Amino acid sequence: MSRIGNKVIVLPAGVELANNDNVVTVKGPKGELTREFSKDIEIRVEGTEITXHRPNDSKEMKTIHGTTRALLNNMVVGVSEGFKKELEMRGVGYRAQLQGSKLVLAVGKSHPDEVEAPEGITFELPNPTTIVVSGISKEVVGQTAAYVRSLRSPEPYKGKGIRYVGEFVRRKEGKTGK
């Protein structure tokens, strides 16, 4: 039995959900998200409650059931509250700048790295070494933050690089002399 799939999703005020043959559109104060779901899972909307039902208890149906419910919940939370990921830069001379919707990173290379914000994503810089990636789609926010991190992921000897705020970076001991 999928415990996640059986949880009811409550629609907050100001959020509308339209289900057209398992193509679900969620509209809210922050924007609109559309996603196509498996035809095997039935999505029911009763007032302000959304439930997902599976036809049988096979292993495949259980996994699709839980995933469908989680994706629906992420859509509802995204259009009502939004998602954000914070990254911090550590290293001498490592800094970020905004040029319009483009993020320009100086991370110890011979050239600055430029990251164009995907549709629906905004970059914020509270200070030159902190980057906040925000948007309504949890998936796109996570992918964008992971891409920015991959431009200079933290190295284990000095810890220099771009990391998520609160991320633990395993440190190694350097070579010992003779």
From Swiss-Prot:
This is Large ribosomal subunit protein uL6. NCBIfam families: L6_bact (TIGR03654). One of its GO terms (cellular component) is cytosolic large ribosomal subunit. Belongs to the universal ribosomal protein uL6 family. One of its GO terms (molecular function) is rRNA binding. Keywords: Ribonucleoprotein, Ribosomal protein, RNA-binding, rRNA-binding. Part of the 50S ribosomal subunit. InterPro entries: Ribosomal_uL6-like, Ribosomal_uL6-like_a/b-dom_sf, Ribosomal_uL6_a/b-dom, Ribosomal_uL6_bac-type, Ribosomal_uL6_CS. GO terms for biological process: cytoplasmic translation. The keyword Cytoplasm does not apply. It comes from Streptococcus pneumoniae serotype 19F (strain G54). The keyword Transmembrane does not apply. This protein binds to the 23S rRNA, and is important in its secondary structure. It is located near the subunit interface in the base of the L7/L12 stalk, and near the tRNA binding site of the peptidyltransferase center.
